[in-house]
């Protein structure tokens, strides 16, 4: 069996159906990534206070009215195909419950919002949102709302809660709301391709691994999440923004860039900045998913005063905002191919998200400490994230900085110090300091790190990866220069003692397969192999990769050879462009196991079907984001495991 059953007929409650937008496709795929490997929160959650004299019945009526107005609140998605269905307003009961609490204070709100966000939402069968009313002394004091990212983004959630708050106050709210289905026809492929080209160019021309050598725990795993709230920094930020005639959001990004440059000595790096894509008036009341990232080029002059830094960030942001509409499925595949070709995973130094309006619907914070700031941090053994994520919001009387960072980039103490240091910089600037950009890092790079043209690389980790190949007996890695074809550009040279049958191609493929799994590595530019038992006088094998202009080696193709490889190859062929011809399930020889999934023209929108086909064949063990990365199919197939057998508990056996 090499194909899945066709989707079931739409239920009678469906009023219209259609494809997911390009942005939705990413979040639809993202929901299949195991939670410890995800960075974006799913579901999103926020709250608003209940203005008196609104009652619980008023809250239910307002939520029902919003459900009728916003089709996104009654949209479900197909589990295997990028399709969405809009249902009638009364298709399901309102997903609202009530909780009695002793007091609706900051601590209670924080815990209750986190608890609601932790409850999974099934966007395939249920409304993609839920609400909870907090009741204190018999009266509703706050409404919490959580929503699935596949139909609502952060800006959309703020629009929704703001309209809920306005309706509870008796204010009029806009009647027109654009659904993502209404924007599918307006997606322009040529504009998307231009944005994707810009992204790939920026990724390839900026260093990767900027933060890694200058902090974190050596070999650290897991990640830290923290939130810093400051009332003092609110006023300081206002003063700095007026001083430099820049938006508060741009000033915070400039401060973050200044901090990275001060810490690392890098003056040119990439920031991935989230934009709302809601410039048109018709979209400002839409709660649907539209936000995407743009590549903001950070280019700072050593010694430049902060005013010059802010101006350069404003200019770079304006240039980047043209590239806010692209196809995540196509860009992720193109980046996987590029990273595998270049031998290094390209990662922006910063991911920055901000809300451009104050959320004045929030419950007022009554527990702000006397010094005007408060911080909490939590650490988890999740998969480390490869960049520094900072979310900024500016609400009534305080700013909030949410930080997520891998322990190998910043340890817990360094993560806690980051937002406090940013607020300290704002205070200095507000007091009139110039705060020039240092020419050199505050501390040198950690031992074992080398700055290649592509970015920072850990020589120790590259050596460990080489030695993890079963045919490599020993290996050393060091920078070297070969003037034969690369203009004298330094690159990594690997010297390895290997088993007699191991070739440079074998070792190179092994390194490429580890790019997405081991942070801080890149493929050597040259391999010098000495087979064990080499006869005296015989030269070692040499091999060059594409570094500094040399010709990219042609990795030989390889058909599937094991049961797991054949199962994966059959699934790839079935979901690939054109599909698999009938009757060829047992002959997927055209699939090259030495290439990654993107090399076969398969993008992330096909991965849910691919995983379902593997499950149908009796295999599991590969995460969806691993399939979308740089690893070869042969490497992925080695991780497949048989599905666990289910114990029979009586009754008829399942077919």
Residue spans for each PLM region:
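Short amphipathic alpha-helices and their capping loops
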Residues: 1-35, 60-104, 127, 177-223, ...
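Extended, hydrophobic beta-loop-alpha segments that form or line the acyl/peptidyl-thioester binding
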Residues: 70, 74, 267-274, 380-442, ...
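A short N-terminal helical cap/helix-turn-helix that marks the beginning
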Residues: 76-77, 164, 168-178, 202-211, ...
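Phosphopantetheine-dependent thiolation modules in NRPS/PKS and related acyl-activating systems
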Residues: 1-6, 501, 522-525, 530-655
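Active-site-proximal acidic secondary-structure segment that organizes catalysis
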Residues: 18, 130-180, 415-428
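A short, small/polar-residue-rich loop/turn motif at beta-strand boundaries
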Residues: 2-15, 51-68, 83-125, 307-317, ...
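His-Asp-centered acyl/peptidyl-transfer active-site segments
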Residues: 14-16, 33-43, 60, 71-72, ...
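Flexible, Gly/Pro-enriched loop and linker segments at secondary-structure and domain junctions
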Residues: 26, 37-47, 73-78, 119-133, ...
